[in-house]
Amino acid sequence: MVWHSGSTPDSHAEIFILNETGWGVVVLTNKNHVLEEASLPEFKKGIINILNGEEPVDIPKNIPIVQIVMSILIFALFITAIVLIIKYKRKKICKKMTWIFLGSLFLILSITLIPLLIYSTNSPWQTIKIFSADVALLISIIVTLLNVNGLISIYIALKSELVNKS
């Protein structure tokens, strides 16, 4: 079998030729989601089985692990924001430097998250937003919540100095 595969940020192409049967197949797909590319080899095996007169293989179910983990992270960040607000309202304030460190950490994470995603997927943010809209939305929510948590933490640090002085 002769086989070639190629991908761009928004499309995927495969060509394979089955020498023993004389069949050749070109599969052009519009990758609507970067994370779904893992199922394409199974798709190819199914086509080969059909051409050989066999039953196609079952493509494994795509469990959206990334989306589930990101949703759990969003929930945790949302709860963290609520806890920070409650701590501020109840005046249960720790050392100022702890809050500044925590706030800075949240802000640094929010600033670096999208560039890290762009670097790790080797795709521009616009492409991620178009072809992985669910991941882009979840990342945007995470960045927003990281910013909110960072700003709340720094606000608590600035107000804690005033509370400790009075």
Tell where the protein language model's regions lie, with residue ranges:
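Catalytic loop of the DD-peptidase/beta-lactamase superfamily, centered on the K-T-G motif
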Residues: 1-166
